[in-house]
């Protein structure tokens, strides 16, 4: 079957363009060993690029051709430059690391990759006898490293905002690096983002889209009205993924009850109900109420309504959330892998609102979904993308929450079976762009101003894996998954800037189809879901 092929005959390639210590960890999509590793033996890799990507060449479904780039060099007559590598099988995780070290490479790690100003980074390099007299350079400032067993480490105060590149010199003329980011303060960053949305991304003109949260063009410093030619207008409209801005503001208000935020939310709630839904709660993403009827949109709107109940205690919002989900289940059944179905939030809201009949009906719907997910197991149906992390993570998130609400062991067992498949999307490279960030490679095209294909490291939906890991930790008591969840949501903070602006995706490869990458897309579009899940993982706000 296609699912079998994807999980057994395809791999998630985790690439580290780490100079003399470059590697590729090709992890089988199904999580089943053996996997394939490539580690550089001689030479240097500076970056990688993607080619053969467009709507007619794999569309969103394949990653393209990956090319590892050599450094620029000038060879005189008679000169030579040798590049060689090892290819080996491995069992995943620690076994990959061990086999890399056995082949005389090194492993670099940091205690974390995004720091608040003033925090201390612990940078560590592990290797064999070849690793000696290590020197660390922080943005070209030299810092001594200390030896500890077969590893070397340095503690560095992160005192300057922005990206910090740690270059590590080791062995005979060899080097590698790690990339970290320093931000001012997480709470301030989120506060500035919320204030920016209220001030700049809510429609104020008196047309039919008034009070909607909209895409913002960071280059033009204005709302993008979705009125110029683009590849997919439904990914830039006034509904759908943009509802994440409303969910973020509602969660933020629960921590910081600011009057302006509540006023903005009340206007937005009215816009959603009166402009994007009909009397029967059929949900659209544009005010003309035409275009695709998309199951994803119902879940996000319902999530928003349930959050609104929490901040107003107005039973009407509990009803709106319930009716929106009922509309989805009536139209789409119980087999769709929607992103972010509010299991705990929805049921607890209906319980708190004393809506016992509705609680029972919604629980029955959720059990029907959960039983479908259990039956399917690892045989995920294709969605808007044939196979991706945002099919697997929502399944795990749903089953874990259903276990929390019902106490039925089968749902936890079903989630456990899917965890290796979810974890296979993540790599361990020493960069805030890459470490535990799920492989995704199409969102920059569909949602960005540059309409650029290629690896998005990070893309905000990578925080779904963070949410799944957090919930798994809550259900099992395994704290290591909580730490991994925190790392994922923290690394996604790079999509938010000190002035309150944001970016929907970072295009990571050096080039895609020959066009320069390595940039944050200029549209603030749908990335605020990253902060929604940050507040789940760090503050426990469902």
Mark where each language-model region is.
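Solvent-exposed, conformationally flexible loop/turn segments
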Residues: 77-78, 115-120, 161
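Low-complexity, Pro/Ser/Thr- and charge-rich linker/hinge segments at domain boundaries
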Residues: 97-119, 176-217
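Extended acidic/polar, glycine-enriched regions
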Residues: 129-191
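Short, small-residue-biased leader/transition segments that mark boundaries at the very start
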Residues: 3-4
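Aromatic/hydrophobic beta-strand junction motif of beta-rich domains
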Residues: 119-129
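Terminal, non-catalytic domain-edge segments
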Residues: 94-121, 368, 372, 395-542
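Beta-strand-rich recognition/accessory modules
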Residues: 14, 23-114
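Catalytic cores of extracellular degradative/oxidative enzymes
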Residues: 186-463, 488
């Amino acid at each position: 079957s296609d699912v079998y092929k994807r999980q057994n005959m395809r791999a998630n390639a985790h690439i580290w363009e780490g100079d003399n210590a470059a590697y590729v960890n090709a992890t089988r999509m199904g999580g089943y060993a053996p996997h394939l590793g490539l580690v550089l033996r001689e030479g240097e890799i500076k970056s990688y690029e993607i080619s053969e990507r467009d709507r007619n060449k794999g569309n969103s479904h394949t990653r393209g051709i990956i090319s590892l780039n050599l450094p620029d060099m000038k060879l005189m007559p008679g000169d030579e430059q040798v590049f060689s590598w090892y290819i080996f099988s491995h069992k995943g995780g620690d076994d990959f690391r061990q086999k890399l070290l056995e082949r005389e490479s090194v492993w670099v790690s940091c205690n974390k990759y995004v720091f608040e100003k003033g925090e201390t980074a612990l940078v560590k390099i592990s290797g064999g006898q070849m690793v000696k007299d290590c020197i660390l350079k922080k943005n070209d400032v030299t810092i001594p490293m200390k030896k500890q067993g077969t590893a070397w480490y340095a503690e560095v105060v992160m005192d300057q905002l922005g990206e910090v590149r740690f270059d590590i010199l080791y062995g005979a003329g060899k080097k590698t690096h790690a990339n970290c980011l320093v931000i001012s303060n997480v709470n301030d960053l989120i506060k500035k983002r919320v204030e920016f949305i209220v001030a700049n991304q809510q429609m104020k003109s008196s047309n039919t889209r008034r009070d909607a949260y909209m895409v913002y063009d960071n280059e033009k410093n204005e709302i993008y009205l979705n009125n110029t030619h683009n590849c997919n207008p439904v990914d830039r409209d006034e509904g759908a993924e943009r509802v994440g801005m409303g969910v973020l503001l509602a969660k933020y208000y629960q921590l910081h009850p600011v009057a302006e935020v509540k006023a903005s939310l009340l206007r937005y709630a009215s816009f959603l109900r009166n402009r994007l839904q009909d009397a029967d709660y059929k949900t659209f993403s544009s005010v003309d109420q035409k275009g695709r009827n998309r199951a994803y949109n119902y879940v996000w709107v319902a999530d928003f309504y349930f959050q609104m109940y929490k901040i107003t205690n107005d039973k009407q919002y509990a009803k709106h959330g319930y009716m929106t989900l009922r509309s989805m289940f009536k139209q789409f059944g119980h087999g769709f892998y929607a992103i972010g179905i509010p299991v705990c939030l929805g049921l607890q809201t209906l319980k708190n609102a004393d809506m016992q009949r509705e609680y029972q009906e919604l629980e029955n719907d959720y059990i029907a979904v959960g039983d479908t997910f259990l039956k399917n197991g690892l045989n995920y149906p294709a969605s808007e993308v044939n196979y991706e992390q945002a099919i697997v993570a929502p399944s795990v998130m749903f089953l874990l929450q259903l276990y929390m609400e019902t106490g039925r062991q089968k749902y936890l067992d079903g989630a456990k079976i899917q965890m290796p498949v979810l974890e296979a999307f993540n790599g361990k490279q020493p960069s805030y762009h890459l470490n535990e960030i799920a492989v995704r490679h199409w969102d920059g095209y569909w949602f960005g101003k540059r309409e650029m294909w290629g690896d998005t490291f990070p893309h905000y939906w990578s925080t779904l894996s963070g949410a799944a890991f957090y919930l798994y930790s809550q259900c099992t008591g395994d704290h290591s998954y909580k730490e991994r969840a925190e790392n994922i949501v923290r690394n996604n903070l790079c999509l938010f800037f000190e002035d309150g602006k944001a970016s929907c995706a970072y295009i990571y490869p050096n080039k895609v189809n020959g066009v320069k990458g390595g940039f944050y897309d200029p549209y603030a579009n749908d990335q605020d879901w990253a902060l929604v899940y940050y507040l789940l993982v760090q503050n426990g706000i469902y």
